[in-house]
Curated annotation (Swiss-Prot):
It is a single-pass type II membrane protein. One of its GO terms (cellular component) is viral envelope. InterPro entries: Herpes_UL45. Disulfide bonds: none annotated. This is Envelope protein UL45. The keyword NAD does not apply. It comes from Human herpesvirus 2 (strain HG52).
Amino acid sequence: MAFRASGPAYQPLAPAASPARARVPAVAWIGVGAIVGAFALVAALVLVPPRSSWGLSPCDSGWQEFNAGCVAWDPTPVEHEQAVGGCSAPATLIPRAAAKHLAALTRVQAERSSGYWWVNGDGIRTCLRLVDSVSGIDEFFEELAIRICYYPRSPGGFVRFVTSIRNALGLP
């Protein structure tokens, strides 16, 4: 006599989950790994190099650093047209604020001088008198003045991002 069951021989306690839903897809793990890896890379770039490596780029050959810019000059006085055309791109004539600051720094030599500097006047003929750092338009200066070329240096967006994170974390 054979044993025969009246119902199914095996009844699962819970319905079977499909194997595709039970596991996290490999694509998701790759995505999470890429995000974590990118975060670790940015963290290493921010934390490992010293602050000095995130500074401004050096000035080109023949140029002197001046605050956040670079300056070059020719001590021979020239006319305005020569001064404007004598600065190679991306440099222009020194802006008025930077010229006043430079004049204040060189005031010791300037007190004995009655010279003038051409300054960037956005197309208007403008100069700065060295003795008292007064600037003007065709009012009091001679036809000749010294040309000082200037170009600003600014850090890129990623450098500003890194330095802001380092500042927020209080890192030196």
